[in-house]
């Protein structure tokens, strides 16, 4: 499997989540020192992660805005330390070009933009400048759709075209349907059922639903975040079967066997 110029063994891969934030919904505050972050990265790599997704600002509903300066202070030391110690691809989870540039300079390989270039109009130019793969996630302000799966597909197709127009090569573009972002539980469920349509857009698809509210709803409600890892793994299997190629998860080990087996059947 290729992500732009980068080659990953197999036809599917796990992206391990590293939140260096104090307020992420699942693990906020757990990895706010470089050493704690490195220890977690080492474990995720041992468990089978092929990409580490570093985020310095929580994107959960109601989270506090973080300036680019503060975000850079959080992510750059961690990215540098990971690159100094491990041979692993790093994605930077940010929608700010200033942070993205600093992360790329520090050694990050991939851009992961939860606003698909809408928040910062220079993100695509930056991706083109660095020949960096970019993941474009569906997002919007309100939970209003005519038909959620079609609307998501239209959005992703339009944003991918905007990236192409800005000089980003097609093989550097990935898409993410954005589970949990501006979507009700019902809308997330409908989107899950239509996931194969997203996978038919012509771009590789990242699947990120780990520990989110829709997983809790599918389990009947009232579960804690870390109690959703088994269901997350089941949904990873479902997504890979629909055609997704990367699963973004908190618990790498719970997903590794699924990815290892299904990767050989894709």
UniProtKB/Swiss-Prot annotation:
Pathway involvement of the protein, from the record: Cofactor biosynthesis; tetrahydrofolate biosynthesis; 7,8-dihydrofolate from 2-amino-4-hydroxy-6-hydroxymethyl-7,8-dihydropteridine diphosphate and 4-aminobenzoate: step 1/2
EC numbers on record: 2.5.1.15
Binding site for (7,8-dihydropterin-6-yl)methyl diphosphate: 59, 93, 112, 176, 212, 248-250
Cofactor(s) demanded: Mg(2+)
Catalytic reaction equation(s): (7,8-dihydropterin-6-yl)methyl diphosphate + 4-aminobenzoate = 7,8-dihydropteroate + diphosphate
GO biological process, one term: tetrahydrofolate biosynthetic process
Record-listed Mg(2+) binding positions: 19
Keywords: Folate biosynthesis, Magnesium, Metal-binding, Transferase
Signal peptide per UniProt: none
GO cellular component entries: cytosol
NCBIfam families attached to this UniProt entry: DHPS
Family the UniProt entry places it in: Belongs to the DHPS family.
Free-text function comment from the UniProt entry: Catalyzes the condensation of para-aminobenzoate (pABA) with 6-hydroxymethyl-7,8-dihydropterin diphosphate (DHPt-PP) to form 7,8-dihydropteroate (H2Pte), the immediate precursor of folate derivatives.
Subunit structure: Homodimer or homotrimer.
This protein's name: Dihydropteroate synthase
Gene name in the database record: folP
């Amino acid at each position: 499997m290729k992500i732009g110029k980068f080659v990953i063994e197999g036809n599917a891969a796990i992206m391990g989540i590293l939140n260096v934030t104090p307020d992420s919904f699942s693990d906020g505050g757990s990895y706010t020192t470089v050493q704690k972050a490195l220890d977690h990265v080492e474990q995720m790599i041992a468990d089978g992660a092929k990409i580490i997704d570093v985020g310095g600002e929580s994107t959960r509903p109601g989270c506090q805005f973080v300036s680019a300066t503060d975000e850079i202070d959080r992510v750059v030391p961690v990215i540098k330390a990971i690159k100094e110690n491990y041979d692993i691809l790093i994605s930077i989870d940010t929608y700010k070009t200033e942070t993205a540039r600093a992360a790329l300079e520090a050694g990050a390989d991939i851009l992961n933009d939860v606003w698909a270039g809408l928040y910062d109009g220079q993100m695509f130019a930056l991706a083109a400048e660095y020949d960096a793969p970019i993941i474009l996630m569906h997002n919007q302000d309100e939970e209003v759709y005519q038909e959620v799966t079609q609307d998501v597909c239209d959005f992703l197709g339009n944003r991918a075209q905007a990236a192409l127009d800005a000089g980003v090569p097609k093989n550097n573009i990935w898409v993410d349907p954005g589970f949990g972002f501006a979507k009700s539980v019902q809308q997330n469920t409908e989107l899950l059922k239509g996931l194969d349509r997203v996978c038919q857009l012509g771009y590789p698809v990242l699947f990120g639903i780990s520990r989110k509210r829709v997983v809790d709803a599918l389990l009947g409600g009232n579960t804690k975040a870390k109690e959703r890892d088994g269901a997350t793994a089941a949904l990873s299997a479902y997504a890979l079967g629909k055609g997704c190629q990367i699963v973004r998860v908190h618990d790498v080990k719970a997903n590794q066997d699924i990815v290892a087996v299904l990767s050989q059947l894709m």
